[in-house]
Amino acid sequence: MNNKNIRNIAIIAHVDHGKTTLVDALLRQSHVFRENEQVQERVMDSNDQEKERGITILSKNTSVMHGDIKINIVDTPGHADFGGEVERVLKTVDGVLLLVDAFEGAMPQTREVLKKSLALGLKPIVVINKIDRPGAQPEKVVDQVIELFIELNATDEQLDFPVVYASAKNGIAKMDLADETTDLSCLFETIINTIEPPKCEIEGPAQMLVSNIDYDDYVGRIGIGRLERGTMKVGMPVSICGKEDKITQGRIAKLYTHVGLKKVEVEEVGAGDIIEFAGLSDINIGDTVCDFEHPEKIPFVDIDEPTVTMTFSVNNGPFAGKEGQFVTSRHIRDRLYKELERNVSLRVKDGETPDSFEVSGRGELHLSVLIETMRREGFELLVSRPKVIFKEIDGVKCEPIELLVVNVPDDCVGNVIEKLGRRKGEMVNMEPAEAGHTKIEFRIPARGIIGYRTEFLTDTKGEGTMNHIFDAYEPYKGDIQARVRGTIVAFEPGKSVTYGLYNAQDKGDLFIGPGVDVYEGMIVGLNSRGEDLAINVCKEKHLTNTRASGSDDALRLVPPLQMSLEKAIEFIAEDELVEVTPKNIRLRKKTLDTKTREREARR
């Protein structure tokens, strides 16, 4: 295909502003699906966790045809934790669709991704989505976006961006709010007229930067990226410029381009198209694939450094090996280092002990998605509380500061400000949002956000939303008070019974019900007081000849609190761990023996 007929764009936005829904609508209206075909919502979110969480985790490619123009579309994650996915795919495109919710306006991740796009000189198209939402203020949001562009030092050319008003859910777009439209035609036309064809050298030796990796059971590792120069053919010998200027040789076995959601095998591809290739078994993200006789490396984009670290270690509890398939340090080590091949924001190094590993990422969600993936693959492991990564700058200890935006009901504002103030949060802006809600911005140490989300949802009766993104490293802000309540810890192994739990529930909130296998040192609840409490939840009522005046079977248990993986990771203190297995998520003390723990506490 002539590269004049190609447009490469990425869709960028804050989480939940409708990127994947817009891609769905573009695919439908370019007749990728048959008229009678049943298509699930958010078809691009193909990963199990993406479907369950309702978010995009991995960036993905697709393409649509509009007339004789091929539009390659890259759908990107909106969560700040997966920012590394966005940063590297921006190198493969020539323009971006900046999607902004007509109700919420520009949010933290919108700012961060736009900043990187403008720095790369990409041409923006602004799409104001959800114009049909009650309370939407599209004109006000356009003004916010213009202010944001000016703040981020956009060039005059970038400031001259087209604005399209859309409802991705209903599949309509218009250039003016007063227009009556029934489809996305004007968005297709705007993309074709605004985004330039790829600036590539048609002639010359082939050259391509690998920006993503996929895997296929039949052909092995697949490299994904944009062909920057020349032509690539099946069977041609190539040179691979890897890390530290290492050059290896290989041969292209298969070539693919995207047509809708399908990969189509081709014999030859010209510069400018986003392609996939197989045949190079040790290819990695950031490598450059070149003509065999002309190895020239393309510099890879700088990925932001991790801000949070956790310790992953071998499960050494009493139930170790009973529920998982991969339980040894070798299994965990191999899996973590394999993850580095495609998860460019991740850092892994060996821990202080032979069976532990320090894993660093962009946030709790980034690491919890990895843990959940490993759990589903059959791994058993222990994980520690997340810790922020400190840096020394000019001899001063510095910590990561986040920009936090919360939207809360008006009657909860005082409580939220007070709680975030205790966590060293500094309020920088406050304005009314929709009816009965207030939007507040804080600058807060990353330490202050860890463990706060569950408390925030309780304080706002489940109505509040919070979003945060890394802002800068600043001098250490001082100590932050940890969890104020202690835990209820089992001190006898066995099976929990109603009688034992009934006595325990007076002391606080329980995490387990009857009939659950427990071991000494396992956390079974949250104490209502500040200290930890060891209790026997396996204790049965002794039988006697004395008849009870009341009914013996009227022991009513309060339903236990359900602990998801994210809640468990947020909940634990420094002396606690989360035991993750394919079947269960348990909380436990680092030191299981009760007497040893009491001795350590007295020191």
Describe the role of every protein-language-model region:
Residues R229-T231, S281-D282, G361-L367, D410-V413, ...:
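Helix N-cap motif at beta-to-alpha junctions
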Residues K123, R133-N193:
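Canonical P-loop GTPase G-domain recognition
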Residues G317-L340, A554, V558:
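A short, contiguous, amphipathic alpha-helix enriched in charged residues
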Residues Q207-M310, P318-K322, R485, G494-T544, ...:
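Conserved nucleotide-binding/hydrolysis modules and their immediate coupling elements
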Residues M1-E104, Q144, I213-D216:
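P-loop NTPase switch module centered on the Walker A-proximal segment
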Residues S167, G351-H366:
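Short glycine/threonine-rich beta-strand-turn micro-motifs
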Residues Q38-R42, L152-V164, P198-L209, E244-H258, ...:
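Interdomain boundary/hinge elements
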Residues H258-V266, C398, I444, E455-D459, ...:
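Long insertion/accessory domains within large nucleic-acid-processing enzymes
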